[in-house]
UniProtKB/Swiss-Prot annotation:
The gene is dabA. GO terms for molecular function: zinc ion binding. It comes from the Bacteria. It comes from Aquifex aeolicus (strain VF5). Part of an energy-coupled inorganic carbon pump. This is Probable inorganic carbon transporter subunit DabA. Keywords: Cell inner membrane, Cell membrane, Membrane, Metal-binding, Transport, Zinc.
Length: 1007
């Protein structure tokens, strides 16, 4: 295959894969909008695209919205306004009250394809009958026009031949994909995985009975005929005769049939550093090629039983020349046939031409009768007075109403929520008292409850900030041996923090410490793998315990794990000279091992090691000292070449180690910038004696979605380490000095930053890293901890009602039950997570401090008065606000269609490959949130509304910043979020809706 064509196919597949969202490994669940790649489109257009590509619903059922209406979440006046905005009744014999009555009655609808149990008015049926007549030719033309947009060859084969090609392909491809993508769960490894997905498939399919039985000889021959995946894609699509202009969308449809696995492969292929991607490469091109080969092979194997060869032109000819048969088959397969005609249609599929007129007439009569009964129920006796033209208009209005009903409900819900929030903000009390202590919490909605209860107990001032606290870092927890990115997925951290045993840090400087970790190289069998990876584990290679685990280090680790009090952290960055010295020492240690174990040179002198390293690194051409040990001339050159190739002692690997170690820690200037910027962003410039930095995490047993309950701003991990590192930096006198110089923020000597963790499953808060404080400070912290414990009890008691359907007067019983939830391995719902989230407030705490937001609002502290140029607001709008929208959309779509966009019931979940879950023994990867997270007793607990972002800032200032941030501007203009600006100087609200900013009239109502 020529290179140009190959590159074209590859780029075509990558573009076609754009609508598919990433799926991250479950151990670091990352909230995302399932339609994230469609955010460049308006929300209303994107959800239609999602329906066509993924077959997913974007709105709830009417009865669910009616339930919201009855609970007061939706106000009737907002529902009426939404009807007026979305449905034009000009010239129709209807009122908006008629539509309101219709939308409020769950049973008031046309019951299509059901047996008639009542007699419809004959005259009315006759008037309506003509509106329900169908033209089979037009129906089939419209259907074929959607080929490549909504349907594939396999879809048409299943639809018109009564086959199950898609299911068969999915079964084979799911098993193949999960075996290939396995990350250590499977006992037997799939052969030839290292050669990539396509070649591993070709090898396996030769001998595997599943492929032989389903695809027969034809699949084997087809598979052998293609050496490259691009060649397979090109040839198979051409063999179907599909016009090339349809290929891009056609490929999208094929990939979307297993959107979970395809999304995971897409994520892996875009993250080349990911260990399993490096070792077992795969991409969408290979995945698509395998899918098309399986599909084509099965079609070839079954070709003899088909009425014609399934190609683009043959289906077109079938629709044109056998209209009646095609039409009736389509009607029957898609369940468009009225129930009472179903058996007759089945019997007459091969006699379609003579039966078609009878069918069309009877179907029109049945549908007209159904609609007549519906009109009678809706409009009463006045329907009899309507003329034929008026009935036609009513039918048109009803069609428009059906198309827009979900959007009508959504806008009414959002308008109601916005009114409730803005009314509450207007009641804000701006008075402030000198606080006893201050606390920074994550913006997570679950923090709102705790903050409110803590403020209620005592004079505490709380702030909200993204839960990585403005400190993006890769963190190496000692018992894991590999790095975690503790920051939003939008950010790739440049600095690494290392957790180590305290006794090691006390004994060694940084350089000596890291060398000590590698000390046991002398005691281990040397391999090329170990030489490179020996230090790599600090920065992302997960091999500790698998390949290289020195005994003394292992014992230190065991001791460390007994208590987190025995740990310390490398936060300060070593100098470049220190890093250079360390890398040289590592390589000298390796060289020493080589001399001793392979050449019998005991205790080689340091000058020999240094000179040998210089030659290996190309700093000198030859070593006379090596000659003294018998390495002369050609023998020396061969020796050096061996060191470079086998033991990786060369400039390239030296540079890699140097680069990785250079990422360790933060300079003092970096620390001052991070802490100063975070404090200024939330408006914290005057300090109480204690400032608590409270990260959050969750605790639940037997829960593959545990990371979905942790901190999204920390990449699905706990926020504890970010809190600890933040406090270590903020408590450093040298850092404080630089903060004062750079930001003008003076942190008093007697102010202490204390890290803590809020367990959102139990609502307990614990303080950490207390050994660094004097004894008198620890005593004061004990008193404050009592207040935090009281806040924990109040918050747990508040959450009890949502978690359990029972009443309990005993407060201790409530708290016990909530805590017990975390440790019950059979519990499918340890907590509600972020269910119910609907708003994101950016502003001072005084705006919402008086409100009970029920743990459903993100709260990000921000004071526009200290941000004259809007740079801090830019950071919030381009980071935390975007992550908030991702979370909101994950919950939104997991609620509107839990089977397609969510992950179904946890009861049927099985962990596969250590990276994902499937339902039962066979399904695509489940990508969204489980039913138990968003539903309670069959009803949605989450409120699926687009995120309401409320910003406190002067109107013109806010607009200028919004216009500078493309990501948020795009979401606003395409109406993926509802954006409201509260101008505190004019006390006015402004909202973006339907293409423009307008003042939002809000007033405080009595009660």
């Amino acid at each position: 295959m020529e290179l140009g064509r190959k590159l074209y196919i590859r780029s075509l597949v990558n573009v076609a894969g754009e609508p598919l969202s990433y799926f991250w490994p479950m151990r670091n669940f990352v909230y995302h909008n399932p339609l994230h790649e469609l955010e460049g489109e308006h929300f209303s257009k994107a959800i239609k695209e999602g329906e066509e590509i993924f077959k997913g619903r974007a709105f709830l059922r009417r009865k669910d919205y009616i339930d919201f209406l009855n609970k007061g979440l939706i106000k009737e006046e907002k529902l009426l306004n939404s009807l007026k905005e979305n449905v034009n009744l000009e010239g129709a014999p209807l009122t908006y009250e008629d539509l309101l009555r219709l939308i409020k009655d769950e049973k008031l609808k046309v019951y299509e394809n059901t047996y008639l149990i009542r007699e419809a008015d004959t005259d009315l049926v006759e008037k309506l009958k003509g509106f329900f007549s169908e033209n089979p030719k037009e129906v089939m033309e419209n259907l074929f026009s959607e080929f490549g947009k909504k349907y594939t060859i396999a879809d048409f084969v299943d639809l018109f031949f009564g086959e199950s090609v898609n299911r068969t392909v999915n079964e084979l491809l799911i098993k193949l994909s999960l075996d290939f993508l396995d990350e250590g769960q499977s006992v037997v490894e799939m052969p030839r995985r290292k050669e990539g997905f396509f070649r591993a498939f070709r090898e396996l399919a030769k001998y595997n009975l599943r492929f032989i039985i389903r695809g027969g000889r034809e699949l084997g021959e087809l598979m052998e005929s293609f050496e490259e995946p691009e060649e397979a894609i090109d040839n198979i699509l051409k063999s179907y005769g599909i016009p090339e202009e349809l290929w891009e969308r056609y490929i999208t449809l094929e990939l979307a049939k297993l959107k979970g696995i395809a999304g995971y492969i897409k994520w892996r292929s875009h993250n080349k550093h990911y260990y399993f991607q490096r070792v077992y490469p795969s991409d969408l091109v290979e995945f698509l090629a395998v899918r098309l080969i399986l599909e084509k092979g099965i079609l070839e194997h079954r070709k003899k039983v088909y009425p014609f060869e399934p190609t683009y032109e043959n289906f077109k000819r079938f629709f044109e020349e056998k209209i009646e048969e095609a039409f009736l088959t389509y009607e029957y397969a898609t369940k468009r046939v009225p129930a009472e005609l179903s058996s007759q249609v089945r019997e007459n599929l091969k006699n379609a031409e003579s039966f078609i007129n009878t069918y069309l007439s009877r179907k029109a009569h049945i549908n007209a009768s159904n609609f007549a009964l519906f009109l009678k129920d809706w409009l009463g006796e006045r329907v009899k007075e309507l003329s034929k033209e008026e009935l036609k208009k009513v039918l048109e209005i009803y069609g428009e109403f059906q198309e827009k009903e979900g959007f009508i409900w959504l806008e009414a819900l959002e308008d109601s929520l916005i009114e409730r929030l803005t009314e509450g903000v207007l009641r804000a009390n701006q008075e402030k008292e000198k606080p006893k202590a201050q606390a920074l919490f994550c913006i997570d909605v679950r923090s709102e409850r705790y903050r409110r209860n803590l403020e209620k107990i005592g004079n505490y001032e709380t702030y909200g900030i993204a839960g990585f606290f403005g400190v993006p870092m890769a963190f190496v927890e000692i018992h894991k041996g590999h790095e975690e990115f503790l920051c939003p997925v939008l950010i790739k951290p440049r600095n690494v923090v290392l957790e180590i045993p305290k006794e090691m840090k006390e004994e060694y400087e940084v350089t000596h410490l890291l060398e000590h970790i590698l000390h046991d190289l002398k005691q281990n069998v040397l391999t090329p793998y170990v030489t490179v990876e020996a230090i790599g584990f600090l920065f992302g290679f997960d091999f500790i315990g698998k390949t290289f685990m020195p005994y003394s280090y292992s014992k230190l680790k065991e001791k460390l794990l007994e208590s987190k009090e025995n740990v310390d952290y490398i936060i300060n960055k070593p100098s470049r000279e220190e890093v250079k010295e360390l890398v040289n020492r590592v390589y000298e240690t390796i060289l020493k091992r080589v001399f001793e174990h392979e050449y019998g040179i005991k205790n080689p002198e340091k000058p020999l090691l240094e000179e040998t390293l210089k030659v290996c690194l190309g700093e000198t051409d030859y070593s006379e000292r090596l000659e003294l040990y018998g390495f002369k001339g050609e023998k020396q050159r061969e020796f050096i070449e061996r060191l470079r190739k086998v033991y990786k002692v060369d400039r390239g690997y030296w540079n890699i180690l140097f680069e990785r170690l250079s990422k360790l820690g933060f300079t003092l200037d970096e620390q001052a910038s991070l802490i100063g910027r975070a404090l200024k962003m939330v408006g914290l410039t005057e300090f109480a004696p204690f400032v608590f930095i409270i990260g959050h995490g969750s605790k639940s047993d037997n829960n593959p979605y545990e990371s979905a309950l942790d901190c999204g701003a920390c990449g699905g991990a706990s926020g504890l380490y970010n809190a600890i590192v933040f406090c270590r930096m903020a408590n450093n006198p040298e850092v404080r000095k630089r903060i004062k110089e750079k930001f003008g923020i003076n942190i008093p000597e007697n102010t202490y930053f204390v890290p803590g963790l809020h367990n959102t499953t139990t609502d307990e808060v614990h303080f950490y890293d207390l050994e660094q404080f004097p004894q008198e400070v620890k005593e004061k912290l004990k008193e404050i901890k009592e207040d935090f414990d009281k806040a924990s009890m109040l918050t747990a008691s508040e959450r009890y009602k949502e978690l359990f359907d029972e009443e309990a007067e005993d407060e201790l019983r409530k708290i016990y039950k909530v805590v017990e939830n975390a440790y019950d391995w059979s519990q499918v719902r340890p907590e509600w997570g972020l269910s119910g989230n609907y708003a994101f407030v950016i502003g001072r705490r005084e705006l919402t401090k008086h409100l009970n937001l029920e743990g459903k609002v993100f709260l990000h502290s921000y004071d526009y008065r200290v941000d004259r140029r809007g740079f801090l607001l830019e950071v919030i709008l381009s980071g935390p606000a975007i992550v908030g929208q991702w979370i909101n959309m994950e919950y939104y779509f997991s609620t509107t269609d839990n089977e397609v966009y969510g992950s179904g019931s946890k009861v049927y979940h099985n962990v596969v490959g250590r990276f994902g879950v499937i339902s039962g023994n066979f399904s695509d990867l489940r990508t969204g949130l489980p039913t138990q997270t968003v539903y309670k007793e069959g009803k949605p607990l989450h409120i699926p509304a687009r995120l309401i972002i409320l910003l406190e800032a002067p109107y013109e200032f806010a607009l200028s910043v919004i216009n500078r941030v493309y990501a948020i501007r795009n979401l606003i203009q395409n109406e993926w979020v509802n954006f409201v600006i509260f101008d505190p100087e004019s006390k006015k609200f402004y909202r973006y809706k339907k293409g423009s900013w307008n003042e939002l009239k809000t007033e405080v109502k009595d009660g």
